[in-house]
Amino acid sequence: QSQKKIRHVQGSHIITEKLYKGEQAYILQLNDKRIIFLIPYLDKYTLIGTTDHEVKSYDSPKITDIEKEYLISSVNKFIKNKITEDNIIWTYSGVRPLVEDLSENASKITRDYTFEIDDKDAPILTVFGGKLTTFRKLSEHALDKISKYIKISNKSWTGNEILPGGEKTTDLNFLIPEGILPRLIKTYGHKITKLNQYYQGFNDGGEHIFNDLYEFEIKYLVLEEMAKTSEDILFRRTKLGINFPKEKLPNLENILKKYL
């Protein structure tokens, strides 16, 4: 049994209306030696993060009042038009599984990952720590570790691999109206050609749900991208849920049921 221990450190973000003009991002250096970032988000918002808040469990992470106050007060030291909690439009949180290194401060705990192989019987590789921004390097190192047990190449190959939807497209004959095309291209990339096929199967894209969300996109997300719930559609596949009205939710769920 491994002697390594994991500490759960929550990171939370807040989204506000756009705080500044331009497409540049900012990294703010704070007095506590931490940094937070401001990033343009979905054209009309600003994403602010992140925090280091140690928690006992990783179930249902949710931003705390302390985290909100920390982000708000930190940003207000750098901007002219101060923000309050009333300016927060949406929040999201996640929990980092960090390897215990006896640091007293959660922000000081190492973000590095480490491996442990037990090959007494059937070999098993355990990965401790890591974070989203290093997932590719972590995965390559993990494959390198297990390559001596199974027939798999340990050569690095993902650095130049095109991400899904990143391929060039020569199909520019879109039937999707220009008014809703920019968001779809930005969201789906090359997969817009497949989405265009779904649009053709409806009269004007099918039932209109809200803003630029139509039935054809719902059908695509269910059949092609494994969306199962309204939350999948509004937050995990798109971020349309940020300003999606609650009264429109029953209509969305009724359409969703047609394709499940």
PLM feature spans:
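C-terminal catalytic lobe of FAD-dependent flavoproteins
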Residues: Q3-I48, H53-E247, N251-L260
